[in-house]
Amino acid sequence: MIKIIRGLDITALGVCVYNRKWQPVHLQQGDMDGACAVFSIMMNLIALKVFTRNQVTNLNTSFKGNTSKGRLFKEFFVTQGLCRGGFYFSEIKEKLSHSFAKEVMSSVRQYATSVSDQASYVEELKIAIDDNLPLVTAITFRGGAHAILAIGYEEQEGVIRKIFCLDPGYTISQTSLWNSVITLNERKGMYCHQYITDNDDKNVFVSETLKIERK
């Protein structure tokens, strides 16, 4: 069984949500100037219909500075800038709480490499997806880490085997709902999952998640 968050659909524009009109959700480097965590957050906010795609890709977007959207836009696009090398999820949660508390609430969880912690991530992921919420997910591999947006999972005989994600580092087909997959528990050891894109694959573990909900 495959479960994808409600509202995502394939149109001539690719994977979209409907917010006044069809809004393409996937953002790739070049659409915005910034780090993978911020890309993933903005895809999340588009999927939640908090922002339109044009609002996050057009850096000339004008918001009143005293509104919640104006404050958030200033935090990410003006005060910090998007090319500072990224944020920890805890920093992003703080910014969301500071600037966007009327619009959304967020929670951060961190995970060790233990079997129990990685299983806790899968439980958190299932709860989020079943509630039709994307989950910003940090994967760690040898020599680095990367932030992606989980939008669904595949369950086989009651066990989640795969997690479907939108990765801002890669292109996406116009006919696809996702462009990367985490295949769970593929090997023993620290990097127990396999992360697959159309270009490569890496052994990874999940180190952190950020869940955002509309109020």
Where are these regions (language model features)?
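Active-site nucleophile-adjacent alpha helix/oxyanion-hole segment immediately C-terminal to the catalytic cysteine
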Residues: M1-V78
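Cysteine-dependent deubiquitinase/ubiquitin-like isopeptidase catalytic cores across multiple families
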Residues: Y18-R20, V78-E124
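Hydrophobic, Leu/Ile/Phe/Ala-enriched alpha-helical segments that form helix-helix packing faces
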Residues: S40, N44, L96-E103, A128-I129
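Alpha-helix termini
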Residues: T52, A101-M105, E154-V159
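Active-site-adjacent substructure of cysteine-protease-like catalytic cores
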Residues: Y111-C165
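Noncatalytic regulatory segments and standalone regulatory/sensor domains
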Residues: Y153-K215
